[in-house]
Amino acid sequence: MLRSFLNHLFGSRGVPVEDDGLRLARDLHDESRHEEAIKVLNALIEFKSGWAKALVLRGATYRALGRMEEAFADLSRALALAPNDAQCLYENAVAWYKTGDNRRALEFCASARLADPGFATPRWLQAQIAFGGEAYMAVLERIHAFLKPRTYIEIGIFQGESLQLARPPTQAIGVDPEPKLLKPAAANHRVYAQTSDAFFAAHDLNVEFGGVPVDLAFIDGMHHFEFALRDFANVERHCTRGSTVLIHDCYPLDRETARRDGAPPFWSGDIWRLIVLLRKHRPDLAVHTIGTAPTGLGLVRNLDPDSRFLTQNHDRLVEEFLALDYSWLDENKPGKLNLVANDWKTVRQLLMQS
């Protein structure tokens, strides 16, 4: 009967019907059609007893519905069948996180990473547990809504999700050498497909924004600190003291994610060096790091558009801070990067300070 049911669902496609079934269940799960996903998974698990992948997905679906007893039953059974499966270990981590047991969640995250070092998803959960509060995109959206900037520039737009937060009447410019926008650019957005160095060499932001200074900037480009240093210097000259510059990826989770030769999807690079540099050599600036997942969000205020210190001393500053090893952060990383709590009341106070 189950074979007939599955064949009726998926037909003859030259692949095992259970593979099509699992694919359908995963799509339903991703679309939050959880009850439908469970019906398909029930049939699959009855048809193919002891199928760990189906048990993991059903456990994750039960977890999404808040049915934790059933979720743990499936995930425990899957774990017994596939103790070294990274996805299974990760879903167990998420389940424990949802129950508030961060210790067990972190243990399963570590096990998932050991099982598959290239599996980056557990890093996101580790970061969320470490920081708490809203993820950086939600914080960025709050900042846009609070500041209502007239002008906004974003360096490193990738798929354009954060650029979309700049809504009319904000004039927005996005810069990225290879933008991969998920949606067409909005009428109030202009996208320049070039490196930030090339953009600033060819364009005057004062002209681009019709004489209006930069109210808000978000630096999220190349994950090497010298690029972020130049981006900051180039943006600051078009700001006012009341402007705000945000810097992504400035609070690394650990040495591995802070490597200069890292790669997405979870890679902060050495942007942390820019925060240290600004705090040391530009004490006139108000520099803080919001502890928001996955890799922190720098917030810089009290900008000085007349300062040329960073550009005039670029090479020696790069040399000085490239020589600073990550181990320097081992003692009091929160203090050295001026970490502040990831709660909106704290962030709003920083945005209101002159």
Where are these regions (language model features)?
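A short alpha-helical cap/connector motif
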Residues: L2-V17, G21-K39, A43-F47, L57-A64, ...
